[in-house]
């Protein structure tokens, strides 16, 4: 796990933005209304609060900058040297020192003007002291413009640096430019480093991660190094030198066998000898890359002697090709194993191991006698082992069939199913049928139960249980069946009558309905009333006694009217109906009009008649005091 995370450094504002932010915050977070007729201690406190609040804002923001940026004396030497190469240690320390001085100056200015404000005897004098205090603070910050800009550039560059853990297991690639270092890291990790056929494509450190033996490894790709004195090396080359000097890693020195990088094998060997002091106490592997173009055996004797001398000194030489991936895994395995062994050896040499070993005691029992006591293996196990060696070949596994058949292989697990009827192996059984889970209705003993049922049925048939004649029904059973039929018919009739009564819609009261005499008589008869003497019934007598209704005589006019009223003129045809033939055509026109409006209503377009009152006085721009010299920013 990396101990440094430079991506969390807060943004460093420019001097102008710094001043604007702080003054705006003071205006927003402190009271803004004061009058000269207030008591003098209240006026002093009002302006003291503004000075102290501004000073505290500057102090907090500058302290945040100082605490976020790493201190070169406290971080790992690898990062300290890397920052010295990239940003110049003196310039970096000077910028942070100036920020620290500015913070102390702001604190002193606030302290002095708060002391002076205690003697202010009017609103005007207190206000002028406040103006002077805030002005001096802003001037101090304005003078730090270059330091703030430099620190912001450093912050941006630091946040883009790869996260390298100096203490974890690391493989470090180095060598001349364009020898295949970036191609190698792309093969062994998921890093996507740009690869081009020209030198110095990689201009900074790149990191990729991989797994080996269930451990996490980081692979660092360094920029190419040229063979010249240290003081002549540029910033790009010095990054590689810094990584070689400080990272405890297995070093992979990559050499180009084909010499397509523009440097011969002798030059690459001279660079190796030049930076060899950086390889002390580190596992080293020489990677002879681009063997797909030319191999060591195809080189001249003089060039072959270079690699033989390296092997004689104890450095393993492995031929690789990142194009065909030949030897890449071998290099990775060899480097990782050597680094693991080196780390264990280093820990064993340390004092911490001795402290632990002193607390450990290995108990070894004394030998009782010289009698041999080999492990006991039963004879059955030995015999079975012999049979396994001699007997017929093993049954082919599905994996063996897959390798044998290749693309024609199809995994079929149903062929191993043990069913009573082998033809049912490939029957399709649905999981869900008509909303029910089929597995819930499957009984393992279903066939056994079916056989028992079939035997029971055979016994019943043999006993003559199903031989009864259907025509042997007596008269009593016939009467029961006839009565049941009448009951069913009556039930259906009742249902129909109930449906008639439950008709929807307006109902006419019973008293308002016209009653037919014949219907009334039939209803009475059905209820059991004797209707033989119906002429003397009360409704017949009442009908004879009642008078016939006299019709009112139509009134006639005795005198003809003096004037005749003019009939009302015909109304003008409505516009939405005019020009249409009949009612059907009117309905069709309205339907078409609604369809045409649907799209416009759905989109909700703003029309010419839609009014909108704009906010003519936005509060965030017009709130607060607007005095002379302030209107350019409000």
Curated annotation (Swiss-Prot):
PANTHER family: NUCLEOLAR GTP-BINDING PROTEIN 1
Organism, scientific name: Mus musculus
CDD domains: NOG
Keyword Ubl conjugation attributed: yes
Function of the protein: Involved in the biogenesis of the 60S ribosomal subunit. Acts as TP53 repressor, preventing TP53 stabilization and cell cycle arrest.
Modified residues (Phosphoserine): 122, 468, 470, 472, 558
Residues in OBG-type G domain copies: 169-340
Residue ranges with Basic and acidic residues bias: 573-585, 605-618
Binding site for GTP: 175-182, 221-225, 289-292
Modified sites of kind N6-acetyllysine: 103
Biased composition (Basic residues): 544-554, 586-604, 619-634
Pfam families reported in the protein's UniProt record: NOG1, NOG1_N, NOGCT
Protein name: GTP-binding protein 4
Gene Ontology molecular function: GTP binding; GTPase activity; preribosome binding
Keyword Ubl conjugation among UniProt keywords: yes
Glycyl lysine isopeptide (Lys-Gly) (interchain with G-Cter in SUMO2) crosslink site(s): 103, 332, 534
Quaternary assembly: Associates with pre-60S ribosomal particles. Interacts with MINAS-60 (product of an alternative open reading frame of RBM10).
């Amino acid at each position: 796990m990396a101990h440094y995370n430079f991506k969390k450094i807060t943004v460093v504002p420019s001097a102008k933005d710094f001043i604007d932010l702080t003054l705006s915050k003071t205006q927003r977070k402190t009271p803004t209304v004061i009058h000269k007729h207030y008591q003098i201690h209240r006026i002093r406190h009002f302006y003291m609060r503004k000075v102290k609040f501004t000073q505290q804002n500057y102090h907090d923001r500058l302290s945040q900058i100082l605490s976020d940026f790493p201190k070169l004396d406290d971080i790992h030497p690898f990062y300290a040297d890397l920052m010295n190469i990239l940003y110049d240690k003196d310039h970096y320390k000077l910028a942070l020192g100036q920020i620290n001085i500015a913070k102390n100056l702001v604190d002193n200015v606030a302290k002095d003007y708060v002391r002076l404000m205690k003697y202010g005897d009017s609103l005007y004098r207190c206000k002028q002291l406040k103006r002077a205090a805030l002005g001096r603070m802003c001037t101090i910050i304005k003078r730090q413009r270059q330091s703030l800009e430099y620190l912001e550039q450093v912050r941006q560059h630091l946040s883009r640096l790869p996260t390298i853990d100096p203490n974890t297991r690391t493989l470090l690639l180095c060598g001349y430019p364009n020898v295949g270092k970036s191609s190698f890291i792309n093969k062994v990790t998921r890093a996507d480093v740009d690869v081009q056929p020209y030198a110095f494509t990689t201009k900074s450190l790149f990191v990729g991660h991989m797994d080996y033996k269930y451990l996490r490894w980081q692979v660092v790709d360094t920029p190419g190094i040229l063979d010249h004195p240290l003081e002549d090396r540029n910033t790009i080359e010095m990054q590689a030198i810094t990584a070689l000097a400080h990272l405890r890693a297995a070093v992979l020195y990559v050499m180009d066998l084909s010499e397509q990088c523009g440097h011969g094998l002798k030059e690459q060997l001279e660079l190796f000898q030049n930076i060899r002091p950086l390889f002390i106490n580190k596992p080293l592997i020489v990677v002879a890359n681009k063997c797909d173009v030319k191999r060591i055996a195809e080189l001249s004797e003089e060039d072959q002697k270079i690699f033989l001398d390296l092997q004689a000194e104890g450095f393993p030489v492995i031929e690789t090709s990142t194009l065909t991936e030949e030897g890449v895994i071998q290099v990775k395995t060899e480097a990782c194993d050597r680094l693991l062994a080196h780390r264990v050896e280093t820990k064993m040499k340390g004092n911490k191991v001795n402290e632990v070993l002193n607390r450990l005691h290995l108990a070894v029992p004394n030998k009782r006698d010289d009698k041999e006591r080999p492990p006991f293996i039963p004879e059955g196990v030995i015999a079975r082992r012999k049979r396994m060696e001699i007997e017929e070949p093993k049954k082919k596994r599905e994996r063996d069939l897959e390798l044998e058949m290749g693309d024609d292989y199809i995994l079929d697990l149903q062929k191993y199913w043990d069913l009573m009827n082998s033809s049912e192996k490939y029957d399709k059984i649905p999981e869900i049928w008509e909303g029910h889970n089929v597995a819930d209705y499957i009984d393992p003993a279903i066939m056994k139960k079916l056989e028992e049922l079939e035997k029971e049925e055979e016994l019943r048939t043999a006993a003559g249980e199903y031989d009864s004649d259907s025509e042997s029904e007596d008269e009593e059973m016939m009467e029961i069946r006839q009565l049941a039929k009448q009951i069913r018919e009556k039930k259906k009739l009742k249902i129909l009558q109930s449906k008639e009564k439950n008709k929807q819609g307006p109902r006419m009261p019973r008293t308002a309905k016209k009653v037919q005499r014949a219907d009334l008589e039939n209803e009475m008869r059905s209820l059991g009333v004797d209707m033989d003497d119906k002429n003397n019934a009360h409704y017949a007598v009442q009908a004879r006694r009642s008078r016939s209704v006299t019709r009112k005589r139509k009134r006639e006019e005795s005198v003809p009217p003096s004037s005749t009223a003019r009939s009302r003129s015909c109304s003008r045809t409505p516009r939405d109906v005019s020009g249409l033939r009949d009612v059907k055509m009117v309905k069709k026109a309205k339907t078409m009009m609604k369809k045409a409006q649907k799209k416009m209503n759905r989109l909700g377009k703003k029309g010419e008649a839609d009014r909108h009152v704009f906010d003519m006085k936005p509060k965030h721009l017009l709130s607060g005091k607007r005095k002379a010299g302030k209107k350019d920013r409000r």
